[in-house]
């Protein structure tokens, strides 16, 4: 089992796994945790180290606010650039087999850290744009594909502002239209 959550030490995931008595890896990479877990699980299954792997993710709005921004009890006004962390959870089973199914993980491209010096905790989307653009461009280059090969291109926590910047960044700097 590979799990991720938005709290330090993946404490929510670890508490949930206590009673299951199965191998467990906690993944801490914020909003990328779920997709990172899927890529790692697919690698484990593909290499024959596991027949199946469960990947789970959870988050809680107020816990994320307290850790990343400001405790909600402070009553800080949220600016329009602020993302809204969901309170929710989800899980998938990654499995190999003789016959590939209609949904497959065939490639994974891990991102690199980019730090352009943005410091606003309420505008993390803008701060993540360079890394998101770099990861997408490297993925397209590595796989020899273009954006038309995909039904959807999804990112983590860019929000409305960061998503708009990413679209413009890719179009203006690289001629890539998403």
Indicate residue ranges for each PLM-predicted region.
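Conserved beta-ketoacyl condensing-enzyme motif
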Residues: 1-28, 149-164
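Acidic, glycine-rich active-site loops and adjacent beta-strand->loop/helix elements
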Residues: 5-8, 31-32, 57-63, 111
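A glycine- and small-aliphatic-rich helix-loop capping segment at beta-alpha/alpha-beta transitions
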Residues: 10-22, 45-47, 68-77, 170-175
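Active-site-proximal alpha-helical scaffold in enzymes
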Residues: 28-55, 94
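Structural signature of cysteine-dependent C-C bond-forming condensing enzymes
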Residues: 47-57, 100-103, 142, 173-178
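Glycine-rich beta-alpha junction loops
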Residues: 59, 109-114, 154-160
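Condensing-enzyme catalytic core mediating Claisen C-C bond formation in acyl metabolism
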Residues: 70-137, 142
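Long, repeat-rich segments with strong aromatic
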Residues: 131, 137-169
């Amino acid at each position: 089992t590979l799990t991720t959550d938005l709290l330090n030490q993946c404490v929510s995931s670890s508490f949930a796994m206590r009673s299951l008595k199965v191998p467990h890896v906690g993944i801490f990479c914020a909003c990328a945790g779920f997709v990172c877990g899927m890529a790692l699980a697919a690698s484990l299954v593909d290499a024959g180290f596991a027949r199946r792997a469960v990947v789970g993710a959870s988050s809680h709005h107020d816990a994320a606010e307290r850790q990343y921004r400001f405790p909600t009890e402070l009553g800080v006004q949220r600016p329009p650039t602020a993302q809204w962390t969901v309170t929710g959870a989800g899980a998938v089973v990654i499995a190999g087999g003789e016959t590939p199914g209609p949904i497959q993980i065939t490639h994974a491209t891990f991102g690199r850290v980019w730090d352009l010096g943005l410091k606003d905790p309420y505008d993390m989307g803008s701060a993540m744009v360079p890394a998101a653009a770099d990861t997408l461009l490297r993925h397209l280059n590595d796989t020899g594909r273009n954006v038309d090969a995909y039904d959807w291109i999804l990112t983590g926590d860019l929000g409305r502002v960061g998503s708009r910047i990413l679209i413009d960044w890719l179009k203006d700097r690289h001629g890539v239209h998403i």
